[in-house]
């Protein structure tokens, strides 16, 4: 399971012109589910998302986590993160989870996040979404579990 995290000042997701999820300061996470992923990997990724230290402390060093600052978490499904781009000029999605499996694990991750963190928003699985954000830094990391 992959999570492309971006530290943001604010972010929102729209579907057909309607805002379906929004946060202020926090993390926007593009979530990619692969075939071999399971709930244990989702739990491991969530632990990293909530505790990975990407926010500045009083000295400006990345010593504070999302939990530490009480920031928002915006989860957006993105199967293209599971693409194999090592050869050719077209991505292969053979390692991406089938839609039903991907949606089940995304929903599991979302439910667990809502159990463990006060501010969680999301996109809509499988929908054409427009993601609007203001990067803070920019600070971007690819987390894998």
From Swiss-Prot:
The keyword Ribosomal protein does not apply. The keyword Ubl conjugation does not apply. GO terms for cellular component: cytoplasm. Keywords: Cytoplasm, Hydrolase, RNA-binding, tRNA-binding. A motif (Gly-cisPro motif, important for rejection of L-amino acids) lies at residues 137-138. One of its GO terms (biological process) is D-amino acid catabolic process. GO terms for molecular function: D-tyrosyl-tRNA(Tyr) deacylase activity; Gly-tRNA(Ala) deacylase activity; Ser(Gly)-tRNA(Ala) hydrolase activity; tRNA binding. It is found in: Cytoplasm. Belongs to the DTD family. NCBIfam families: D-aminoacyl-tRNA deacylase. PANTHER family: D-AMINOACYL-TRNA DEACYLASE 1, D-TYROSYL-TRNA TYR DEACYLASE. An aminoacyl-tRNA editing enzyme that deacylates mischarged D-aminoacyl-tRNAs. Also deacylates mischarged glycyl-tRNA(Ala), protecting cells against glycine mischarging by AlaRS. Acts via tRNA-based rather than protein-based catalysis; rejects L-amino acids rather than detecting D-amino acids in the active site. By recycling D-aminoacyl-tRNA to D-amino acids and free tRNA molecules, this enzyme counteracts the toxicity associated with the formation of D-aminoacyl-tRNA entities in vivo and helps enforce protein L-homochirality. Homodimer. This is D-aminoacyl-tRNA deacylase. It comes from Stutzerimonas stutzeri (strain A1501) (Pseudomonas stutzeri). The gene is dtd.
């Amino acid at each position: 399971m992959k999570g492309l995290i971006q530290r943001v000042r604010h972010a929102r997701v729209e579907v057909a012109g309607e805002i379906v999820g929004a946060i202020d300061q926090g993390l926007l996470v593009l979530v990619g589910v692969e075939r071999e992923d399971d709930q244990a990997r989702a739990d491991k990724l969530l632990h990293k998302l909530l505790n990975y230290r990407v926010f500045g402390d009083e000295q400006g060093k990345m010593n504070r986590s999302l939990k530490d600052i009480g920031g928002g978490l915006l989860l957006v499904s993105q199967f293209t993160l599971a693409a194999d781009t090592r050869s050719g000029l077209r991505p292969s999605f053979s390692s991406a989870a089938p839609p039903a499996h991907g949606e089940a694990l995304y929903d599991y991750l979302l439910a667990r996040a809502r159990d463990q963190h006060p501010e969680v928003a999301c996109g809509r699985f499988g929908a054409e979404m427009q993601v609007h954000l203001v990067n803070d830094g920019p600070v971007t990391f690819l987390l894998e579990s």
